[in-house]
C-alpha cells in the first residue's frame, strides 16, 4: 500500500519544483510508473482474502480493481488536460495537477480503509478537489450552478450517514468493517433501525447516482473540464457502489424488507435515463445520462445481495469506468476542435479524422455491451441474477439493453457519419497524445476479455 501512497504524495513536490519545460511530461511519466506498479495489487493474499498494510488500510479482491483503476486514471487525466491547461499561467497549472493528485490520494485511502469513519472522511474529502476543478476550470458560466448542485446533493446525502455511523459507534464501540459484519442489531424491525438503514445507504445512492437523486450528475459532467468528467465517471461514481457493497453486508437482515422501493427505482431508472439519452442534443449530457442508466443496474444488483449480482456489479463498475472515461475523452477531442458539444454540429467527422472514428466505434460498442467485452459479462451476471430474484425484471432490463444499443449507435452515427459540414473542413488533425490516451482506455478493456476473473471481486 505505502509503495503506491508515498510515491503519489511525492508527486506534490515534483509538481511544485519541476522546471516548466518538463512539468507535464515528468508528472505523466511518474504517475504512469505508479499505475504500472499498482498492477501488483492483483496478487492479493487469497488465503485470508485481505492484504494488510496496517490496522486501518488493507486491500481485498473487491477494492483491488478499483484501486488500480484510480491509479490508472491519473496519467490519463493529465494527458487529456494538457491541451487546454498549458496556455494558463504556470501557478494555475501546478494547482490543477495538485488537485488531481490529491484526488488520487483521497481515493486510494477511501478504497483501502477498514474503518468506516476513515472511509467517510475520505469519501467527503474527494468532494473538495472535484468541486474546485468544476467551478474553476469548467467551460461555461453554468459551472457555478453545477458546482452548487454537486455540493448540496452530495452533502445532504452524506450527513445522515455520519449520524448513522456515530450511532453505530455508540452501540457497538467500534466501526471496523471486520467486527461490524459479525455483530447483530437488537430488534431489526423497529422504526429507528429502518431510519438507520436508510441513512446508511442514502449517501451512496446519491453518489452512484440512483434515478431520482441523479440531477447533479448531468450538470456536473457537462460543465466539468475533461479531467473532472473522467474522474467523476470512472471512479467517483464507483465510490458509491463500493460503499454500498461494503455497508450492505453489515445491514442484514433489514435489507430484505427495506430494499424493494430502491430496487424498483433503480430498474425503472435504467429505462427512463436510457430514454432520456435518445433525445439529448448535447454529447456530454448523453454520456452522463448513460452513466446513470448503467449505475441503475449496479444499484439493483447490490441491493439483491447474491454472489452473482455482486460479481456483476464490480465487473460492470470497472468496465463502465474505463469506457465512459474513453467516451468523455472522445467528446473532448471534438470539443477542442469544434468548440461545441452539440451533436448536429459535428456530423461527418469520420472523413476528416478516420482513426478517431475507429476509437468512437470501439468505445460505443463496448458501451452497448457487445460480446465479449467485460461490460457484457457484468450486464449478463446482473440481468440473470435479477431475473432469478424476480422474473418481471427481465422486461425492464431487456428494454434498457435495447435502448442502450439504440443511443450508442445513434451517438456514433450522429458524430461520425452523414454529410460533412462546411465549417469542419479546416479541423486540426488528431494528435499522437490523443491516440495514446484512447489506447490506454481501450486496451485494458480488451485485455480484461482474456481474464475477467481479475475484476469479479470476492464472491467467486
Curated annotation (Swiss-Prot):
Broad EC category = translocase
Example GO BP = ATP synthesis coupled electron transport
Q: Where are the transmembrane segments?
A: 22-42, 59-79, 94-113, 117-139, 148-168, 195-215, 231-251, 258-278, 286-306, 310-330, 343-362, 394-414, 436-456
Q: Which UniProt keywords apply?
A: Electron transport, Membrane, Mitochondrion, NAD, Respiratory chain, Translocase, Transmembrane, Transmembrane helix, Transport, Ubiquinone
Q: How does it sit in the membrane?
A: Multi-pass membrane protein
For this UniProt entry, the molecular function terms from Gene Ontology, in alphabetical order, are: NADH dehydrogenase (ubiquinone) activity; ubiquinone binding
Reactions catalysed: a ubiquinone + NADH + 5 H(+)(in) = a ubiquinol + NAD(+) + 4 H(+)(out)
E.C. number: 7.1.1.2
InterPro entries the record matches: NADH4_N, NADH_Q_OxRdtase_chainM/4, NADH_UbQ_OxRdtase, ND/Mrp_TM
Q: What's one Pfam family here? A: Proton_antipo_M
Cellular compartments per GO CC: mitochondrial membrane
| Localization per record | Mitochondrion membrane
Q: What does this chain do? A: Core subunit of the mitochondrial membrane respiratory chain NADH dehydrogenase (Complex I) that is believed to belong to the minimal assembly required for catalysis. Complex I functions in the transfer of electrons from NADH to the respiratory chain. The immediate electron acceptor for the enzyme is believed to be ubiquinone.
Q: Which family does it belong to?
A: Belongs to the complex I subunit 4 family.
Per its record, how is this protein called by name?
Answer: NADH-ubiquinone oxidoreductase chain 4
Organism for this UniProt entry: Scyliorhinus canicula
Specify the taxonomic lineage: Eukaryota, Metazoa, Chordata, Craniata, Vertebrata
Amino acid at each position: 500500500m505505502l509503495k503506491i501512497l508515498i510515491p503519489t504524495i511525492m508527486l506534490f513536490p515534483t509538481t511544485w519544483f519541476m522546471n516548466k519545460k518538463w512539468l507535464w511530461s515528468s508528472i505523466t511519466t511518474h504517475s504512469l510508473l505508479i499505475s504500472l506498479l499498482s498492477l501488483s495489487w492483483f496478487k492479493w493474499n487469497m488465503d485470508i482474502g485481505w492484504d494488510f498494510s496496517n490496522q486501518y488500510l488493507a486491500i481485498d479482491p473487491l477494492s483491488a480493481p478499483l484501486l488500480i483503476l484510480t491509479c490508472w486514471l491519473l496519467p490519463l487525466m493529465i494527458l487529456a488536460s494538457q491541451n487546454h491547461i498549458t496556455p494558463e499561467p504556470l501557478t494555475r497549472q501546478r494547482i490543477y495537477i495538485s488537485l488531481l493528485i490529491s484526488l488520487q490520494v483521497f481515493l486510494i485511502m477511501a478504497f483501502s480503509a477498514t474503518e468506516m469513519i476513515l472511509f467517510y472522511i475520505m469519501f467527503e474529502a474527494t468532494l473538495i478537489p472535484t468541486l474546485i476543478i468544476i467551478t474553476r476550470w469548467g467551460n461555461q458560466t453554468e459551472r457555478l450552478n453545477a458546482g452548487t448542485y454537486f455540493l448540496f446533493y452530495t452533502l445532504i446525502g452524506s450527513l445522515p450517514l455520519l449520524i448513522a455511523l456515530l450511532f453505530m459507534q455508540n452501540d457497538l464501540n467500534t466501526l471496523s468493517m471486520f467486527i461490524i459484519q459479525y455483530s447483530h442489531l437488537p430488534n431489526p424491525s423497529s422504526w429507528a433501525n429502518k431510519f438507520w438503514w436508510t441513512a446508511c445507504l442514502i449517501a451512496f445512492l446519491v453518489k452512484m447516482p440512483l434515478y431520482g437523486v441523479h440531477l447533479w450528475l448531468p450538470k456536473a459532467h457537462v460543465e466539468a473540464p475533461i479531467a473532472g468528467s473522467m474522474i467523476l465517471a470512472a471512479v467517483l461514481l464507483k465510490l458509491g457502489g463500493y460503499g454500498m457493497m461494503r455497508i450492505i453486508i453489515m445491514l442484514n437482515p433489514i435489507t430484505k424488507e427495506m430494499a424493494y422501493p430502491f430496487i424498483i427505482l433503480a430498474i425503472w431508472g435504467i429505462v427512463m435515463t436510457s430514454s432520456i439519452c435518445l433525445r439529448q442534443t448535447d454529447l456530454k449530457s448523453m454520456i452522463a445520462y448513460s452513466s446513470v442508466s448503467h449505475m441503475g443496474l449496479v444499484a439493483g444488483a447490490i441491493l439483491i445481495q447474491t454472489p452473482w449480482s455482486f460479481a456483476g456489479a464490480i465487473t460492470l463498475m470497472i468496465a463502465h469506468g474505463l469506457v465512459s472515461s474513453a467516451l468523455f475523452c472522445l467528446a473532448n477531442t471534438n470539443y477542442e476542435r469544434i468548440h461545441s458539444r452539440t451533436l448536429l454540429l459535428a456530423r461527418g467527422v469520420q472523413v476528416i479524422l478516420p482513426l478517431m472514428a475507429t476509437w468512437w466505434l470501439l468505445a460505443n460498442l463496448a458501451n452497448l455491451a457487445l460480446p465479449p467485452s467485460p461490460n457484457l459479462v457484468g450486464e449478463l451476471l446482473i440481468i440473470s441474477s435479477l431475473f432469478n430474484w424476480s422474473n418481471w425484471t427481465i422486461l425492464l432490463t431487456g428494454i434498457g439493453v435495447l435502448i442502450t444499443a439504440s443511443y450508442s449507435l445513434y451517438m456514433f452515427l450522429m458524430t461520425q457519419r452523414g454529410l460533412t459540414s462546411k465549417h469542419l473542413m479546416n479541423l486540426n488533425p488528431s494528435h499522437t497524445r490523443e491516440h495514446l490516451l484512447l489506447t490506454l482506455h481501450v486496451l485494458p478493456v480488451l485485455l480484461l476479455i482474456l481474464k475477467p476473473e481479475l475484476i469479479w471481486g470476492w464472491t467467486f
